Structures are given as structure tokens and as C-alpha cells.
Curated annotation (Swiss-Prot):
This is Cytochrome P450 1A1. Pathway: Steroid hormone biosynthesis; Lipid metabolism; fatty acid metabolism; Cofactor metabolism; retinol metabolism. The keyword Lipid biosynthesis applies. Interacts with cytosolic chaperones HSP70 and HSP90; this interaction is required for initial targeting to mitochondria. Interacts (via mitochondrial targeting signal) with TOMM40 (via N-terminus); this interaction is required for translocation across the mitochondrial outer membrane. It comes from Macaca fascicularis. The gene is CYP1A1. GO terms for cellular component: endoplasmic reticulum membrane; mitochondrial inner membrane. Its EC number is 1.14.14.1, 4.2.1.152. A cytochrome P450 monooxygenase involved in the metabolism of various endogenous substrates, including fatty acids, steroid hormones and vitamins. Mechanistically, uses molecular oxygen inserting one oxygen atom into a substrate, and reducing the second into a water molecule, with two electrons provided by NADPH via cytochrome P450 reductase (CPR; NADPH-ferrihemoprotein reductase). Catalyzes the hydroxylation of carbon-hydrogen bonds.
């Protein structure tokens, strides 16, 4: 009996010692908070796994609910890694715009190292002068071969020319499907049409809708968003990288195939490159590489491998977001036929049928613009920005944020915040129309989909123009529908860009 009591006391003392040691390690690992500041609040997480179970399959929803309790600045753990979560339009603008230099970093996540061998402009951890110079170069190239006017074309700019051509081909492909099976999955055809636009801008060429290499690449692209979406456990718990993981293996395969495809395209451009005759973005990057003109003051040069990475970033950003936006738009059109009719009435009144829509028509089509804004807001198909990280010790709203802290920016929460939106769960384009029939500029600027500040998507303007032009050309010519009684599944599938379930029951007819 005495022996048992002695053992129980020993066990109790040992357990107490372990508890105190663990408590001390946790306290010691937390950064010292400067006087006058405090640590961000947040719920207690499980040992080892943190809040993974709480995040579930829809982290944007879980973290939005959490923000209602803990506020717009809160902290969770994924595994043992602390993650700052930002919600609320004012808070996010404060962090990414007013304090942009503090929050412009990228965390060195495992999945990010697999993109462009860790040298991606969008996903890589660099945020210094080299990154800034590459970003400026990419922006200039994108502007030169999309927004700039083409003297040999009647279109207002290169982008308008490319989109107009691809929209006409897309309509023809959909007509073929109606003449055959009598229905179609629009995503299958939209994705190639949009990919062809960015291919024309980057490589000066387009591909047939049955081009097998391009088809295999774009069909794998969904896996990309699934892995790099905010909250992927393998990014925070190293052991998960070594367990069987179909998504992660597919992600590695996709990045290798994309990289190989880009290398092949750039090698072909080098063979046919002619100084003074710049055909596309790739040619312009080669010219900068040869003349070492990326940033003369900093003496920064662009290597051949960096060209591959820049083009890869532009290609990825230029097709996935636009494809997803158009695909969601079509889903909203068939589930809201009243809205579709109203857009077409506006097109008929402003443009008619004798000419195709142009980018210059955009400011005269407020209901079309309101529909696109409401599609962006309601779907919020980019629920989080690509994760940020802090570049130095800083503070936000009275909370201390140490250097190197991973930061999730919840765009979905902004777009569904009841403080900003009346009945946010309702799809209502009219919310963006003022009493005099114009777009409400103040309200439209509250829709956040492309990030803010120094890491804002460089292709935002072009993406908005492209979505507008594709939809305007399609809806001027075509009416979309699904058969009576067919249920359209609008449930988002979580990822970096959230897709909807495939709908094979789309139908279309040319407008009389």
C-alpha cells in the first residue's frame, strides 16, 4: 500500500513537472510583447495539430465565424505554427495599404517552394529590390501586349483583338455541341478560350481546342488551387509531406509539366528572336535579358531561368482567375434568367446587333458591370489572398505582430460582411446601381478579390476587362439555359480559387 502511494506521488510530481515544462516552453516561445501592445486573441488549439480540425473543409467560413467572436485581428495555430488572420475591410486596408511594407512578405511554405523551383514572383519569399524590379518588368510587358493598341488591327488594343477572336471560336464550339449531344459543360471550352488569350499575349500564338498538351495542363490546374489554398496542413506539419498524398503528388506533377512547357516555348522564342521585332511578352523579356536593362541602377539582371518563372507567373495568373470568373458568371446567368434578360436588353439598347461589343462600351453598360461585381462579391471565388508574411516587427490595431508571421487575409469575409452589405447572401446586381442608373463607385470599391497593396494582382485591370468583353460578346449573341427541373449545384469547392461542381447540362441558342 505504501509502495502504491509512493508511486502515485512520483507520477503526480512527474506529470506536474512535464506540465510546467510544456507551459514554460510555450510561454518562452511566444514573442515578448512591447509595452502598450498585446498579443492577438484567438481560441485554444489542440496540441500538435493546432486548429486544423476547426478550419475543416471551408477555412474561409470557419475563420469568418471566428472573427465575429475574436475580432478582425486574431491568431490561430496550424500545427505548431502561429498564423495571423485578418478580416474587416478597414483592418485589411490598414495592413496591406497603409502598412504595406510591413505586410508585403510571403511565408516560405513548402508548397510555394515547388512552384518555379521556389523562384516564383507571386509565391516566392523574396520581397526586396530584385522582386520589385521583376514585378515592374512583368507589369510593363503585360501592359505593352494587352492594353496597348495594335496599329495593324481595328480593335482598340491587343486584348480586345484576342478576346474577340476567341469568343467567336467559343460560340462556334458551343454550337457544335448543341448540334451533337445537345448539351455541354461550359468550363471545358471556356478554359481553352481564356488560355489562348494569355498564350497570344505571352507567346504570340493560339491553340486548337483539342490540343492535347494544353488540355492536359489546364485540366490539371484545379489541383494547383487545391494545394496552395490558405490552410493546407502539409505546409505547416512537415510529416504530412511524406505520407501518401494524391493532391500533393498531382501538384508536383503539374508544376513540372508547366515548367517544361514554358521552357520549350522560350527555347523556341530564342531560336526565332529578332532584335527590333518584338512579338510578345516573351520576346520583350528576352530583349531585357540580352541588354541587361531590368534595373540598371541596382545592376539587377534577368537570367534565362527567371524569364521562365516570370512567364509562368503571368500565364498562371492570366488564365485561372479569368476562367473561374467567367464560369461562375455563366452559373449565375442560368440560375437567374431575369438578370440575363436584363443584361441583354442593355446590350441591345446601347450596342445593338450590328457590331460586336468593345472595351470602350464598358462605361455605358452599368448593369453588365453590376452583374460582374456581384458575381465577384457573391462567389468570392478567391476567398483568401495568397498568404502574406510580415517583413519586420510591427503592430496592427494595438496588437503586436513579430517579423516572419504568416498572415491569412480573408477576402470572403469582407465580401459577406453584414456591416458592409445588405442581405449579403442574396445575389442582387442592383445593389451596385445608384438611383440615377450609374455604378455606385464607393460600394464597388468594397468588393475585394484581387488583393490590395504591394502584392495586389498585377493583372487585375486586364482580368476585369477580359471578363467583361467575353461576357458582352457571348450575351449579345447567345442565350444560356439549363433544361427545366435540372438542379445547378452552386456549392463552392475550396481552393486558392474556388470552383463549382461541373455542370454538364448547359444549353444555348443563338438570339434571334
Amino acid at each position: 500500500m505504501l509502495f502504491r502511494i509512493s508511486m502515485s506521488a512520483t507520477e503526480f510530481l512527474l506529470a506536474s513537472l512535464i506540465f510546467c515544462l510544456v507551459f514554460w516552453v510555450i510561454r518562452a516561445s511566444r514573442p515578448r510583447v512591447p509595452k502598450g501592445l498585446k498579443n492577438p486573441p484567438g481560441p485554444w488549439g489542440w496540441p500538435l495539430i493546432g486548429h486544423i480540425l476547426t478550419l475543416g473543409k471551408n477555412p474561409h467560413l470557419a475563420l469568418s465565424r471566428m472573427s465575429q467572436r475574436y475580432g478582425d485581428v486574431l491568431q490561430i495555430r496550424i500545427g505548431s505554427t502561429p498564423v495571423l488572420v485578418l478580416s474587416g475591410l478597414d483592418t485589411i486596408r490598414q495592413a496591406l495599404v497603409q502598412q504595406g511594407d510591413d505586410f508585403k512578405g510571403r511565408p516560405n511554405l513548402y508548397s510555394f517552394t515547388l512552384i518555379s523551383n521556389g523562384q516564383s514572383m507571386s509565391f516566392g519569399p523574396d520581397s526586396g529590390p530584385v522582386w520589385a524590379a521583376r514585378r515592374r518588368l512583368a507589369q510593363n510587358g503585360l501592359k505593352s501586349f494587352s492594353i496597348a493598341s495594335d496599329p495593324a488591327s481595328s480593335s482598340s488594343c491587343y486584348l480586345e483583338e484576342h478576346v474577340s477572336k476567341e469568343a467567336e471560336v467559343l460560340i462556334s464550339k458551343l454550337q457544335e455541341q448543341m448540334a451533337g449531344p445537345g448539351h455541354f459543360n461550359p468550363y471545358r471550352y471556356v478554359v481553352i478560350s481564356v488560355a489562348n488569350v494569355i498564350c497570344a499575349i505571352c507567346f504570340g500564338q493560339r491553340y486548337d481546342h483539342n490540343h492535347q498538351e494544353l488540355l492536359s495542363l489546364v485540366n490539371l490546374s484545379n489541383n494547383f488551387g487545391e494545394v496552395v489554398g490558405s490552410g493546407n496542413p502539409a505546409d505547416f506539419i512537415p510529416i504530412l509531406r511524406y505520407l501518401p498524398n494524391r493532391s500533393l503528388n498531382g501538384f508536383k506533377d503539374l508544376n513540372e509539366k508547366f515548367h517544361s512547357f514554358m521552357q520549350k516555348m522560350i527555347k523556341e522564342h530564342y531560336k526565332t528572336f529578332e532584335k527590333g521585332y518584338i512579338r510578345d511578352i516573351t520576346d520583350s523579356l528576352i530583349e531585357h535579358c540580352q541588354e541587361k536593362q531590368l534595373d540598371e541602377n541596382a545592376n539587377i539582371q534577368l537570367s534565362d531561368e527567371k524569364i521562365v518563372n516570370v512567364v509562368l507567373d503571368l500565364f498562371g495568373a492570366g488564365f485561372d482567375t479569368v476562367t473561374t470568373a467567367i464560369s461562375w458568371s455563366l452559373m449565375y446567368l442560368v440560375t437567374n434568367p431575369r438578370v440575363q434578360r436584363k443584361i441583354q436588353e442593355e446590350l441591345d439598347t446601347v450596342i445593338g446587333r450590328s457590331r460586336r461589343p468593345r472595351l470602350s462600351d464598358r462605361s455605358h453598360l452599368p448593369y453588365m458591370e453590376a452583374f460582374i461585381l456581384e458575381t465577384f462579391r457573391h462567389s468570392s471565388f478567391v476567398p483568401f489572398t495568397i498568404p502574406h508574411s510580415t517583413t519586420r516587427d510591427t503592430s496592427l490595431k494595438g496588437f503586436y505582430i513579430p517579423k516572419g508571421r504568416c498572415v491569412f487575409v480573408n477576402q470572403w469575409q469582407i465580401n459577406h460582411d453584414q456591416k458592409l452589405w445588405v442581405n449579403p447572401s442574396e445575389f442582387l446586381p442592383e445593389r451596385f446601381i445608384t438611383p440615377d442608373g450609374a455604378i455606385d463607385k464607393v460600394l464597388s470599391e468594397k468588393v475585394i478579390l484581387f488583393g490590395l497593396g504591394k502584392r495586389k494582382c498585377i493583372g487585375e485591370t486586364i482580368a476585369r476587362w477580359e471578363v467583361f468583353l467575353f461576357l458582352a460578346i457571348l450575351l449579345q449573341r447567345v442565350e444560356f439555359s439549363v433544361p427545366p427541373g435540372v438542379k445547378v449545384d452552386m456549392t463552392p469547392i475550396y481552393g486558392l480559387t474556388m470552383k463549382h461542381a461541373c455542370c454538364e447540362h448547359f444549353q444555348m441558342q443563338l438570339r434571334s
